[in-house]
Regions:
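Basic/polar N-terminal segments that are highly enriched at the extreme N-terminus
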Residues: 1, 152-155
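Extreme N-terminal tail/first-helix region
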Residues: 1-24
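Low-complexity, charge- and small-residue-enriched intrinsically disordered regions
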Residues: 16-31, 119-123, 143
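A generic local structural motif
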Residues: 18-20, 46-47, 131-133
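Short secondary-structure boundary/capping segments within folded domains
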Residues: 23-26, 40-43, 137
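Short, solvent-exposed coil/turn segments
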Residues: 27-29, 44, 74, 140
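Short beta-strand segments
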Residues: 29-64
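Short, structured beta-strand-loop surface elements
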Residues: 64-153
Length: 155
């Protein structure tokens, strides 16, 4: 097991508790709890993740060595996001492999949250942009999940 996996195994329960508490403001500006039903188990799962808004969509990133994103491989999949203690519903779509769509959205995400760049082995330049060299094969290292929020969330 990688050190990073151990770190997140310890941190995730703490973050779930914090994000559901009245002290959520310490982290909820850019960390959400993604909730979804497992395709095979039909159990509810929750995983804390960094998030970024892009228009009316929410962007989530993951590395290939995690498993949660494998539930979204076939088609848009219903999910819930807890953002600032408010539950938002939407449909999650997985994007993987090399594509301009994935690269541009990963670059947008990391420009908003540069602290996450090291997780995905991306270096940032002095202007705060991901370096071209480290973005070259980003689709081989990073999974992008785009959550299209339901219209009812705006009510």
């Amino acid at each position: 097991m990688r050190i990073q996996n151990i770190f997140f195994a310890v941190l995730n329960p703490v973050m779930r508790t914090l994000l559901k508490s009245r002290f959520h403001r310490l982290a909820s500006r850019d960390i959400t709890i993604l909730s979804y039903r497992g395709r095979k188990t039909n159990r509810w799962y929750e995983t804390p993740l960094s998030y970024v808004y892009r228009g009316q969509n929410i962007l989530l990133l993951s590395s290939y060595n995690t498993r949660w994103w494998q539930n979204f491989t076939d088609e848009p999949y219903p999910v819930e996001l807890l953002i600032k203690r408010k539950t938002l519903r939407g449909m999650a779509t997985l994007h993987s492999g090399q594509s301009e769509f994935l690269s541009s959205n990963v670059a947008f995400f990391l420009k908003q949250l540069p602290r996450d760049a090291s997780i995905y082995s991306v270096k940032m330049d002095s202007a705060g942009d991901p370096t071209e060299n480290t973005m070259k094969d980003i689709g081989d290292r990073v999974i992008l999940v785009v959550v299209e929020l339901d219209a009812q969330n705006n009510n």
